[in-house]
A protein has these predicted regions:
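Small-residue hotspots at the loop-to-helix junctions and early N-terminal turns
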Residues: 44-55, 130, 134, 193, ...
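Short runs within selected transmembrane alpha-helices of multi-pass transporters and secretion channels
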Residues: 68, 137-155, 163-171, 192-207, ...
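Generic alpha-helical transmembrane segments of integral inner-membrane proteins
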Residues: 21, 25, 29, 33, ...
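Transmembrane helical elements of multi-pass membrane transporters/channels
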Residues: 15-34, 136, 147, 170, ...
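Residue-level signal for short hydrophobic patches within transmembrane helices
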Residues: 6, 10-29, 33, 56-63, ...
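Short alpha-helical transmembrane segments in multi-pass integral membrane proteins
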Residues: 1-17, 75-140, 184-240, 296-362, ...
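Small-residue-rich hydrophobic transmembrane alpha-helices
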Residues: 47-107, 144-163, 270-334, 367-389
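Helix-terminus/linker motif at the lipid-water interface of multi-pass membrane proteins
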Residues: 25, 29-48, 117-124, 180-187, ...
Length: 449
């Protein structure tokens, strides 16, 4: 367990962030490995089938991350306040709520998968593989939620290293299983999805074993599972807006993908490859944001608001530096990375992947600030602002993708996300400073600098 309420903010945040960064990189490798194996062993259509439904898969991932991450904010605040009994009860409540949430998600997915895929304009030649991939992921949602919930709880108590170790193991297992299922067993795209589910289940099991042996504070009792509507609401108040916020972002990506799917398999493959490479480059900024959520949650629980202000300012500056570095790497070397996804990719795939990267990198500055301010406000318990920022992103991304593609085609599609980043970052920056000044006016023991 790590207390982040004492000491120099960056000296606490950076060591905490590094395991998160490595973990997030492996999380991306976890997903990229499937894309590479599918693309290089089966072909461009298989890669396009997985890529065409990638936003749907990411929607499921971020819903579980958002809900469990919101619940863990409550756990982190209780830990920061020194309420260890509350920490245990929070873990039990998170388990109950996450289980209910997974059941609802699975039922909704089974009922609406065909209409959703139809709305996404999945090409007929990709439909069977695309549907089988998504449904296998859906049936394994309980494993995805288990790992995300338990790893978020561990991080809320200051342990960011252990979830990393388990994720590394799961990533390696996923690669091995994907190769076996696809090459040896000939299961194709469904084999890739099954490998992912099995690896996620194994990482969740490792978390359970570790908590049982090393974290007595999380050894929940039967009495901890007693339903308390007020306590449940405290978790839902944080988890639901965060899940809605993430799902709104995911919906925006689904809309963009649906428009992209109209351009054919090669454009889908190009867009998928470029997005995967970009996500890898953005991980330092994402990791700083995740670290700030824990940092602000603990300091908010300890009523140390001045530390929140200092930490956010310093982390924002550092994240900006990383965004400039990532932009340079993606602009000059992004195209070379695209070749890992396909064996002998066509000139069109390479050109369109390069085009997306070159048009998006100038806007990484805005994206870096989104991660810092959104997670910081979330850690302070102001759950509606991150959700509203997601709505801003959805509206801007959808409008840009819909209207710009009419006149500019694929080029207009490439500008949709950057436009959304600009609008959302401005909204979050203004909201964070408004609420910080509100705390200062209430004479809560700190001054803005």
């Amino acid at each position: 367990m790590k207390n982040m309420t004492e000491g120099e903010p960056l000296k606490l945040i950076i060591p905490f962030m590094i395991p998160l960064l490595i973990g997030n990189v492996f999380q991306q490798l976890y997903n990229i490995a499937d894309i590479i194996i599918v693309g290089r062993t089966i072909g461009v259509n298989a890669l396009a089938a997985v890529g065409a439904t990638a936003p749907l898969f990411m929607m499921l991932v971020i819903l579980t991350l958002g809900m469990s991450g919101g619940f863990s904010v409550v756990t982190g605040q209780l830990f920061g306040a020194g309420d260890l009994d509350g920490v245990r009860r929070s873990a039990a409540m998170s388990t109950m709520l996450c289980t209910m949430f997974v059941i609802i998600m699975m039922a909704a997915a089974v009922m609406f998968i065909d209409p959703v895929l139809a709305l996404m304009n999945i090409p007929p030649e990709l439909y069977a593989d695309a549907k089988s991939y998504v449904m296998i992921i859906v049936y394994g949602l309980i494993f995805m939620m288990a790992y995300n919930m338990l790893s978020n709880i561990l991080r809320s108590l200051g342990d960011s290293k252990t979830p990393l170790y388990f994720l590394i193991v799961a990533t390696l297992l996923n690669i091995v299983l994907a190769l076996v299922f696809i090459i040896n067993f000939g299961w194709g795209v469904p084999g890739s999805a099954l490998a992912l589910v099995v690896a996620q289940g194994f990482s969740g099991l490792l978390c359970i074993i570790y908590i049982a042996k090393k974290f007595p504070v999380l050894h929940v009792r039967l009495s901890d599972f007693k339903w308390d509507s007020r306590f449940a609401w405290e978790h839902i108040r944080m988890g639901l807006p965060m899940a809605v916020q993430f799902s709104v972002l995911g919906l925006g990506m689904i809309i963009i993908q649906a428009i992209c799917n109209q351009f054919g398999s090669e454009t889908i493959a190009a867009f998928t490859s470029a997005m995967r490479i970009e996500q890898l480059a953005l991980q330092p900024m994402i990791s700083f944001g995740l670290a700030m959520a824990v940092y602000t949650a603990q300091n908010f629980g300890a009523r140390k608001f001045g530390r929140i202000s200092r930490g956010v300012k310093k982390c924002s500056q550092l994240s900006l530096a990383f965004s400039l570095f990532a932009a340079v790497i993606m602009y000059f070397f992004g195209q070379e990375m695209i070749g890992i996804f396909l064996d002998n990719p066509s000139p069109k795939v390479m050109a369109e992947a390069k085009q997306y990267l070159h048009l998006s990198v100038p806007f990484y500055f805005f994206l870096s600030q989104i991660f810092i301010y959104r997670n910081s406000v979330q850690g302070m318990g102001i759950s509606m602002i991150p959700m509203l920022s997601g709505v801003v992103e959805l509206l801007l991304r959808s409008a840009a993708a819909s209207y710009l593609t009419i006149d500019y085609g694929y080029t207009g599609e490439c500008y949709a996300s950057p436009i959304a980043w600009v609008g959302s970052s401005i909204f979050l920056f203004a909201s964070y400073h408004y609420f910080l000044r509100l705390l200062a006016r209430k004479n809560l023991g700190f001054k803005l600098k």
